């Protein structure tokens, strides 16, 4: 069993894959690895670039698909064929710091953590010009023995994760009812995790080019709402404090969609927003179901089905 499995969904990344894969090749540290790339029916030359750029790397799998389902589905697909103790999850249009994986893996083993999150740095450079810096030894790391509480905060949505494969399986991976995995993955993992590490280590460097699905604002609002709504409905046993927090997040996502011009029950939403601020909103009430229906009616978002 390898120490880590890189699980890497790919969609139309032909132009940037050579630089990302170069940073994979340049990883330092004493660990064994396998590489699982899952192509999401790319319409560019991503598959041929993957084959060319990974030639000579041991233990590479390239999983091909004929339909486009989104990163949440493809991440789960890749995780199912992984065999490593830990999964390493990155976006394929960034550059990885040379000791990123060794740093995350070392932290996980030192603290007995089953999920570790690193930071990212947005640059003004094209990806070809990025020279990611080595992570220093004296990085600050917060240890969270209540992972769900931390996951309901901010700052964990970037794909800079190292997680135990067993935890990923136990949590069911990403919510496949939501196209983008950024919000659902940390939430679902944290609900089952024993220890989450949040480190200041900058593990990926992000170029000033291209576009992320999560840059689409209505897609972002839709997927945030659906993530929290699904989680609420799937976990009726959650503590009331967490249910209240999740309800607030649903209201916030809907309010932002309304602000951006999408049809929502406006007056009721404003009342719900202020009720949530006062801790009076009931997350189990019918109003969230009405918002769910409103989001389902929005045509300008991508859905796995």
Label each PLM-derived region with a short phrase.
Residues 201-209, 214-241, 262-277:
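Catalytic core of nucleotide-sugar-dependent glycosyltransferases
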Residues 1, 260-305:
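Membrane-interface aromatic/basic loop that binds lipid-linked glycans or pyrophosphate carriers
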Residues 13-26:
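Short, well-formed alpha-helical segments that are part of the catalytic scaffolds
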Residues 39-48, 67, 91:
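A conserved acidic beta->alpha catalytic loop
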Residues 87:
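Short aromatic/hydrophobic "clamp" motif used to bind/position activated sugar donors
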Residues 101-131:
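Conserved donor NDP-sugar-binding/catalytic core segment of glycosyltransferases
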Residues 65-82:
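Glycine-rich, basic loop-to-helix element that forms the pyrophosphate-binding segment
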Residues 141-219:
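Conserved nucleotide-sugar donor-binding catalytic segment
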């Amino acid at each position: 069993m390898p120490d880590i499995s890189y699980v890497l969904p790919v969609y139309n990344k032909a132009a940037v894959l050579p630089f990302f894969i170069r940073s994979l090749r340049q990883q330092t540290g004493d660990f064994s690895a396998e590489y699982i790339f899952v192509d999401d029916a790319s319409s560019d030359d991503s598959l041929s670039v993957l084959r060319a750029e990974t030639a000579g790397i041991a233990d590479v799998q390239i999983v091909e698909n004929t339909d486009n389902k989104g990163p949440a589905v493809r991440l789960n697909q890749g995780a199912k064929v992984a065999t490593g103790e830990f999964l390493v999850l990155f976006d394929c249009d960034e550059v990885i710091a040379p000791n990123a994986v060794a740093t995350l893996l070392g932290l996980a083993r030192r603290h007995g953590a089953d999920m570790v999150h690193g930071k990212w740095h947005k640059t003004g450079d094209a990806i070809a010009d990025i020279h990611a810096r080595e992570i220093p030894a004296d990085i600050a790391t917060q240890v969270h023995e209540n992972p769900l509480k931390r996951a309901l905060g901010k700052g964990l949505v970037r794909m800079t994760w190292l997680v135990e494969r067993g935890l990923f399986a136990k949590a069911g991976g990403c919510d496949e009812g939501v196209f983008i995995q950024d919000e659902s993955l940390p939430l679902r993992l944290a609900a089952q995790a024993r220890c989450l590490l949040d480190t200041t280590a900058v593990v990926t460097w992000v170029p000033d080019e291209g576009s992320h699905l999560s840059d689409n604002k209505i897609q972002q609002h839709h997927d945030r709402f659906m993530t929290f709504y699904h989680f609420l409905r799937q976990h009726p046993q959650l503590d009331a404090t967490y249910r209240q927090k999740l309800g607030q997040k649903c209201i916030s996502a809907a309010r932002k969609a309304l602000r951006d011009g999408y049809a929502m029950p406006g007056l009721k939403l404003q009342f719900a927003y202020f009720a949530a601020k006062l801790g009076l909103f009931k997350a189990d009430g019918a109003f969230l179901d009405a918002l769910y229906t409103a989001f389902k009616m929005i045509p300008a978002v991508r859905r796995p089905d």
